[in-house]
Regions:
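RNase H-like polynucleotidyl transferase catalytic core
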Residues: 248-264, 417, 423
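Heptad-repeat positions
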Residues: 23-26, 30, 37-40, 44-47, ...
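Glycine- and acidic
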Residues: 93-101, 119-123, 195-199, 412-416, ...
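Short, charged amphipathic recognition helices of the HTH superfamily
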Residues: 102-119
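Basic, short loop/linker segments at the boundary and entry of helix-turn-helix/winged-helix-like folds
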Residues: 3-14, 28, 37, 63-101, ...
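A polyampholytic, Gly/Pro-enriched intrinsically disordered region
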Residues: 267-288
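RNase H-like nuclease fold core
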Residues: 67, 74, 78-93, 108, ...
């Protein structure tokens, strides 16, 4: 300091005072800045606390808003989706598709009742169609499915069968699927995999009639790659005419029907089996109104024959087990004397039932294999290897040989890489859906409801409803019924009763 003091004109004492005052001034300024910084820090902390509090309040308010929306929705009655009515209709395609799908599953009258129950539960005041209206919708959908354009292709596989109830009328149904669109091996054919190609009611379905029907369908869809039928000769022989225009058209037999025939040849030819079935029928009548009713033999339709043998054998094995286990829960309140008197006869058939069950095991395994895998080169060899998992005896080996021979005979008709279905169970299932729709009327003869058959294969959607109703009017649907059904058995019955009242 003093070394450089010569630079200044003022005295050192004056300079020292100036420097001391400057230092004090800077110190005071620094102190004030520090106080300002501390005050700003405190303000920042207050702001952060206020911000956190505000964020908590916002989160709480969001929760309250969600709850208020829920409460508001609960207070307001539900409304059905927007569904403008179709032209010249009182209802929209959404409600129509729902009613049609319900009718196909639970019945016509029940479909409207179900809708009424659901809407009442939701608190929705909505007018519903009458069940007769739903019936008309279903019939229009069926006719539209039948008259929809068929894709021309050379790999159609047809499945043909007849359905009849009472009277002379039979309905010919032919469904089809493309070989190129078959489900992958291991997957059975579903309703959505097929489409209705032909559906014609008629009285006479002889070989010539079937040939004409096949030719009419071939004009629309092209010559088929294969035709699958059951054992009915008119269905099988009628398809021979198709080979005139396409020699490589394959005629495929129904594996399940053949399996039932093999069972009939092996098991049905057993004298013991005739005695067994006779005793089974007597037992059913004897115990159906007693304390043994839960052990009653199953009811088997005579027409089903050996196709439903498994249910009877399952019953026999169940009863034989309980005969050997007197303390089973199923035998409570049944005295040993009553059990032996009514069901003890099965003991003498124990070995027979075991033998027949082994035959049925062969058939069950084979039918499942064919349903899932189809017919292909090497199918018989694969099935033969699966038989190794079964306990075979002389009778069951005979059944196995008969089924393998049937497969090998069909394999000879195939080209390399071809794979075809060998069971029309999907078509039989379609007939079952129709009988389910008819309910108690399924034994009274065909009615105009037959027009709805084509609507049962696919679920209705708003889009399919629009398409079907744009192509088939009520008048066209009634024309189809008039042209194809004529006077039905129920109509004739109604006329007969009406005439008798008039005369009386």
């Amino acid at each position: 300091m003093f070394i450089r003091a010569g630079q200044y004109k003022s005295r050192p004492r004056v300079l020292a005072g100036i420097f001391l005052r400057s230092r004090d001034t800077q110190a005071e300024r620094a102190r004030r800045k520090a106080e300002e910084i501390e005050e700003l820090r405190r303000d920042r902390q207050h702001v952060q606390r206020d911000l956190a509090s505000a964020q908590e309040k916002i989160a709480d308010m969001k929760i309250q808003i969600v709850q208020l929306k829920i409460d508001n929705q609960q207070r307001q009655p539900p409304v059905l989706p927007h569904d403008p009515a179709l032209p010249c209709h009182e209802f929209g395609p959404k409600i129509i598709s729902v009613c049609v799908n319900l009718a196909a599953n639970v019945g016509l009258r029940a479909s409207v009742r179900c809708m009424d129950i659901v809407l009442a539960w939701l608190g929705v005041d909505e007018r519903l169609p009458d069940w007769t209206t739903v019936r008309g919708w279903l019939m229009r959908m069926g006719v539209a499915a039948l008259e929809a354009p068929i894709e021309q292709a050379d790999d159609w596989i047809w499945m043909a069968d007849h359905s009849n109830q009472i009277g002379q009328e039979k309905a010919l149904a032919i469904i089809g699927l493309r070989a190129s669109k078959m489900p992958s091996p291991g997957t059975a054919i579903r309703h959505e995999d097929v489409r209705l190609l032909m559906f014609e009611p008629g009285i006479n379905w002889k070989t010539a009639d079937m040939s004409a029907a096949y030719e009419r369908l071939a004009e629309k869809a092209g010559q088929p790659l294969a035709v699958l039928t059951d054992g009915a000769c008119e269905l099988r022989d009628g398809a021979l005419t198709l080979q005139n225009d396409r020699p490589d058209t394959l005629l495929v037999g129904d594996f399940k029907h053949h399996a039932a025939n093999v069972l009939k040849q092996v098991v049905g030819a057993d004298e013991r089996f005739s005695k067994f079935t006779s005793q089974t029928g007597s037992t059913r009548s004897a115990i159906q109104q007693t304390e043994l009713a839960h052990l009653m033999p199953v009811s088997v339709r005579p027409k089903a024959g050996f196709m439903n043998l498994s249910a009877t054998l399952k019953w026999a094995n169940m009863v034989l087990w309980h005969l050997s286990h007197p303390h089973s829960a199923a035998r409570e309140q049944i005295t040993p004397g009553r059990m032996n008197d009514k069901l003890g006869w099965l003991r003498s058939f124990r070995d027979d039932v075991a033998r027949w069950s082994r035959c049925q095991d062969v058939v069950s395994l084979s039918v499942t294999f064919v349903n899932e895998q189809g017919l292909f080169c090497g199918a018989a060899d694969q099935l033969s290897r699966r038989f190794r998992s079964l306990e075979l005896c002389g009778a069951s080996q005979t059944v196995a040989d008969g089924l393998l021979e049937f497969l090998r005979d069909h394999e000879l008709k195939l080209q390399d890489g071809q794979r075809l279905p060998m069971s029309p169970e999907i078509l039989e299932s379609c007939f079952g859906l129709f009988k389910q729709l008819e309910r108690q009327h399924s034994k009274g003869g065909f009615t105009s409801l037959l027009a709805s058959f084509g609507a049962l294969l696919q679920l209705a959607t708003p889009e399919s409803v629009r398409d079907a109703f744009s192509r088939v009017s009520v008048k066209q649907m009634r024309t189809w019924v008039s042209d194809n059904l004529g006077t039905t058995v129920p109509s004739k019955r109604k006329t007969a009763y009406a005439e008798s009242k008039t005369v009386a």
